[in-house]
């Protein structure tokens, strides 16, 4: 029974890793007053771009950084449509999801062809912090990205709730008119929030391809983006 509980906790941390990244990204967006429904497509694009860059470069970290940049681009596109052009958030978000998904599928077929055998890479190795501890050893034998995701939770909380940037961000989300009257650039803050959020979402997607699976499949994200939106609501936007 003890081994089962230990293995369950360890597996929970691994499974939660992409959800943590993407949920933190969505938190930035929603605290700025933007419901980013492009999260599913951004995660999918992160999985594709991360796997492709890692496969072509031979470096898993290059894959993660490529996914980060690609996600930031997705966030910028979302800001262009929903913030600058005033397109309905739901329409622009779903449009981003469709666009990023289509680009990923098209790019994958162009680069890797349509072979029945999916290409694969050597994924991240698990890092054990307590290798000689029978309880903590299995729990803290995780991927580097898992440790980064866990560390980001208090960091993001501090940024959002304990800094001037976070105060302005929450003000933009709660009352953009009053924030604008106070001389704060609402467009700029929302754009920054969407870019940061998109980057985190894509890194969450890249975890699936460069750490968990070592491959890319068309159903790799499997609705995790929508789960993250639900987690934001259940967590009361904290």
PLM regions and their residue ranges:
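Transmembrane helix-bundle core of multi-pass membrane transporters
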Residues: 100-162
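Small-residue faces within membrane-embedded alpha-helices
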Residues: 12, 16-23, 44, 67, ...
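Alpha-helical transmembrane segments within multi-pass membrane transporters and channels
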Residues: 58-103
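Membrane-interfacial amphipathic/re-entrant helices at transmembrane-helix boundaries
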Residues: 1-22, 35, 49, 56-62
């Amino acid at each position: 029974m003890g081994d089962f509980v230990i293995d369950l906790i360890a597996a929970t941390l691994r499974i939660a890793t992409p959800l943590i990244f993407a949920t933190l990204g969505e938190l930035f967006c929603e605290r700025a007053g933007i419901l980013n429904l492009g999260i599913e497509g951004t995660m999918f694009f992160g999985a594709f771009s991360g796997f492709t860059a890692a496969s072509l470069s031979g470096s898993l970290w290059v894959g993660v950084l490529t996914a980060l940049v690609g996600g930031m681009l997705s966030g910028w596109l979302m800001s262009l449509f929903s913030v600058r052009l005033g397109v309905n958030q739901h329409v622009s978000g779903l449009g981003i999801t469709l666009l990023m998904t289509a680009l990923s599928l098209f790019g994958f077929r162009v680069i890797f062809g349509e072979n029945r055998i999916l290409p694969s890479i050597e994924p991240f190795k698990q890092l054990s912090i307590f290798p000689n501890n029978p309880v903590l050893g299995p729990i803290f034998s995780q991927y580097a990205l898992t440790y980064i995701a866990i560390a980001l939770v208090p960091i993001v909380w501090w940024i959002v709730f304990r800094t001037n940037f976070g105060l302005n961000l929450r003000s933009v989300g709660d009352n953009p008119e009053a924030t604008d009257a106070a001389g704060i650039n609402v467009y700029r803050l929302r754009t920054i929030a969407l870019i940061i959020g998109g980057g985190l979402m894509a890194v969450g997607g890249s975890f699936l391809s460069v750490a968990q699976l070592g491959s890319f499949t068309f159903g790799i994200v499997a609705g995790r983006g929508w789960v993250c939106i639900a987690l934001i609501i259940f967590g009361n936007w904290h």
